[in-house]
Design a protein with these regions (language model features):
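Sec-dependent signal peptide recognition
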Residues: 2-10
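C-terminal motif of bacterial Sec signal peptides marking the signal peptidase cleavage site
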Residues: 17-18
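Metalloprotease/metallohydrolase-associated module, dominated by Zn2+-dependent proteases
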Residues: 21-23, 35-45, 103, 170, ...
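Sec/Tat-exported extracytoplasmic proteins
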Residues: 49-50, 63-73, 135, 139, ...
Length: 354
C-alpha cells in the first residue's frame, strides 16, 4: 500500500470517529504514519552495508520465523513482518490500564474498528502518563505499561520493530506468532478472549518452531522462561481472585482497604520467595517497583485468564491448527456470555479461571 493510500486510510479513521476522541485518534494516526515513514523491506535492510552484522543475523532469523508462521502454523501469509522500522525508542506504544478502587475489572474504551478493549494505547509515554494522571484524579487505580508490538488486525502490514528485534529468537517468534494470531481470529469487545487465544497460539507455535530448528539451547531457555511466566501468572491470579472475593463482600470501605492492603502485601512477600527459585531472573521486579494495584493485576489477567481453556480446545482438536482455528472462529460468533461459558466448560473446575 502506498504512503498516500495509507495516509488516506488513516485520515478516514479520524473522520469516521466523529468529534469524540478526535485528539486520541489523531495521535494514533500520527504514530502510525511515523512507523510507515521509517519502515524498509527486511531484504533491503539485510543487504545494506550500513546494517550491523548483529541486526542482519536477527533479521535473517525473522525471515525464517515469518515463513514458518504461514507455512507450518497456518497464520496469514501477507506483508506483515516483512519490513523493519527503527523507532528509536524502547516501546512502540504505552498502554494505560485503569480499574476502580474496589474492583479488578478493568475500565474499557471503545474504538472504531477494534471495538471495546481493556486498555488505551499511546505512541508517546508523555501522552500515556497524562491520560493516566487524569484517570487517577478521577479516583481510578492506574497502570502504564510499555508494549514492544501491536497488531493492526490485518488492516495494514505490521513491521518488525527495533523494540523487540534484540529479544532471544524464541521470544521474537513468540511475539510474531501472537500478533499474527490476531489476524486469524479477533472478536470485538472481548479482550480476554482475543489475548488468551493469541497467547495459546504463541506458546504452541514456539514449541513447534524450536522442534523444527533443533535448537536445544533455545528450547531449554524457552521452557525456563515459560515456567517462570506460568508461576508468576498463577501467583497473580491467586491474589486477583482473593481481591475479587473481597470486593464482593459488603464490609465497610475502611475495612475493605485494610484487607486489600494485606492481600497486596502478601502478594509482594510471596513474589520475593517465589523468585528465589528462578536462578537469578528478576524480570518481574520492575512490575513490583510500584505498589501493585487492581489495574496492574487486571493487565496480567487480560492475557492469561483463558489460556488453559484454549489449550484444552487445541488438545480436543488433536493439535491440528486448522481445526483449532475453525473451532475458535465458531466460538467467536457466539454471544460473549455463551462464548465464555463454552470456554470454561473445556477445563476442569480446579483450572477454570475466575
Amino acid at each position: 500500500m502506498s504512503l498516500i493510500l495509507r495516509l488516506a486510510s488513516a485520515s478516514l479513521l479520524v473522520l469516521m470517529s466523529g468529534c469524540a476522541n478526535v485528539s486520541y485518534y489523531l495521535q494514533s494516526v500520527s504514530g502510525q504514519l511515523d512507523i510507515w515513514r521509517r519502515e524498509r523491506p527486511v531484504e533491503g535492510v539485510i543487504a545494506d552495508p550500513a546494517t550491523s552484522a548483529a541486526l542482519k543475523q536477527k533479521l535473517a532469523t525473522v525471515v525464517r520465523i515469518r515463513d514458518f508462521a504461514s507455512r507450518d502454523l497456518g497464520l496469514p501469509d501477507n506483508r506483515s513482518y516483512r519490513s523493519y522500522a527503527d523507532l528509536e525508542r524502547p516501546f512502540v506504544v504505552w498502554n494505560v490500564f485503569a480499574a476502580p478502587e474496589f474492583s479488578v475489572q478493568p475500565v474499557r474504551w471503545c474504538f472504531l474498528f477494534a471495538g471495546c478493549v481493556s486498555y488505551r494505547g499511546y505512541f508517546a509515554k508523555t501522552d500515556a502518563d497524562r491520560f493516566a494522571a487524569e484517570l487517577s484524579g478521577q479516583g481510578y487505580e492506574i497502570h502504564v505499561g510499555g508494549v514492544p508490538a501491536y497488531s493492526t488486525l490485518g488492516y495494514f502490514a505490521d513491521p518488525v520493530l527495533n523494540t523487540f528485534i534484540h529479544y532471544p529468537n524464541a521470544e521474537i517468534a513468540r511475539l510474531i506468532f501472537h500478533e499474527l494470531a490476531h489476524q486469524v481470529v479477533y472478536t470485538r469487545d472481548d479482550t480476554v478472549f482475543n489475548e488468551s487465544f493469541a497467547v495459546a497460539v504463541e506458546i504452541e507455535g514456539v514449541k513447534r518452531w524450536l522442534a523444527r530448528t533443533g535448537d536445544e539451547r533455545g528450547r531449554a531457555d524457552f521452557e525456563r522462561r515459560q515456567r517462570i511466566r506460568d508461576e508468576f501468572t498463577r501467583l497473580i491470579e491467586k491474589h486477583r481472585e482473593r481481591l475479587e472475593a473481597l470486593y464482593r463482600t459488603r464490609i465497610a470501605p475502611d475495612a475493605m482497604r485494610s484487607c486489600k492492603a494485606q492481600i497486596l502485601g502478601e502478594l509482594e512477600q510471596e513474589y520475593r520467595a517465589l523468585k528465589q527459585g528462578w536462578d537469578g531472573f528478576t524480570g518481574y521486579d520492575r512490575w513490583f517497583a510500584h505498589k501493585p494495584n487492581n489495574a496492574q493485576l487486571a493487565s496480567i489477567a487480560i492475557y492469561t485468564q483463558m489460556v488453559p481453556a484454549f489449550q484444552a480446545l487445541l488438545a480436543r482438536e488433536r493439535h491440528e491448527l486448522g481445526r483449532f482455528y475453525k473451532a475458535v472462529r465458531e466460538l467467536a460468533r457466539l454471544p460473549m456470555e455463551e462464548r465464555t461459558a463454552a470456554l470454561r466448560a473445556l477445563v476442569p473446575p480446579s483450572r477454570t479461571p475466575e
